[in-house]
Amino acid sequence: MRFILKSIRRLIEAALIAAAVALGGILATHFWMRLKFHALLQGGAPQSPANVEDRDMTSLVERLRQVPFKGKSANIPGMAKGAIMNSFLLALNAARATSGVMYPYPEEFEHVVIESFDGTPLAAAVGIHKDGIPRPAIVISHGFMGSKNDHYIIDTALTAYAEWGFNVLGIDLRNFGRSQSLAHGPTTAGWRESEDLLAAAKYMSERPEVTSVGITGFSMGAGSTMLAAAKAGEFPYLTGGAIAWNGYADAGRMISHISTRPPLTDPFFPVYLGFRLMHKIRREDMKGYIDDPELRPYLDAGFGTSDFTTYVEKISAPHYGVSTEEFYRNASPANFMADVEVPLLVVHAEDDPICPASEMDFVIEAAADNPNVHVMMMPAGNHCMFRYLDKGWYDTVMRDFFTYWATW
């Protein structure tokens, strides 16, 4: 018994030390981001883009492929930094009370609520330069269970605003971040979120300080971005190109993948446990606003007995009045790549454990006859870790792409 108690005490001590290290890292990073932001803040305009008549997606992508990439899958410090900066926030984001509390935006950003096309209110942080010079804008979207306050999102937003000179909007997609406190419409794996992004693009395009609007998203935000690009003909507010980082082709296949327990040795296993934990936290939170007795068994289910496929079947698809099959069809970007009429760059990593690289085979096939869509596969990058493995490469690709497609 003494040995057991001693072991438990050691585990608790180790957990407290790990939590202290993570919290210290987050606070230090927050301070460093603010310091860098104010050091870079200039107010100058982005570099002028190419002549509109000379712009060509194929030649641009070939140029971006030549940007030196130093990222390696064995970059343990970069991977550890990304995990520390973002994993703790994902757990906080799972509940309304704690979502978006870390990494607040600086005072140069205005907090607004915009309305998606189905009436869903969405929280956003908007950075508009005050020098009176109209300039292009970028809408930046987080991934599943994330928020606009995730480290990689806010760091990208602050860099785009202060260093590249863009206007910026960081969005909390429906049911995530502060948006989950505004309405309880469930997430749709990118289907309705694509319209959230286009509503954000509409909001920015109506600002007199904005000349064109690009969209970029990560993971589920990437799927949302790909779907938004396909809908840009119907919602003509995406005028400055789009980049999707670590997206997917088939939403049903992806939700099944993250809901299926992998072997202990699989790199995805710790992420799977994290998803399970976040789903459990989210279900506990949902008890505060769902009182349907038929859903109680789902909400009360244990850590390992309910998953995201159940969420789609019992919560999301019924809420939007569609079958599960129609839900997945609407949320699968590969079904709509032939419809994309705006420049869309899809960046993916060969070693992505969450959205497997094989997903891109389906995207490439679906977009084979569409010159507006290009897929750029990188040898490493894990899942949305490009910024931590090679920030110089990541910044260059992002800045050069959106500068190229910006209009004035």
Q: Where are each of the predicted segments found?
A:
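Acidic catalytic loop of the alpha/beta-hydrolase fold
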Residues: 350-355, 384
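Alpha/beta-hydrolase-fold enzymes
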Residues: 19, 24-25, 29-49, 53, ...
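Short, surface-exposed "cap/lid" segments of acyl-processing enzymes
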Residues: 127-173, 180
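N-terminal cap/lid segment of alpha/beta-hydrolase-fold proteins
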Residues: 88-132, 387-388
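Catalytic histidine-centered segment of alpha/beta-hydrolase-like enzymes
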Residues: 381-392
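Alpha/beta-hydrolase active-site loop
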Residues: 186-208
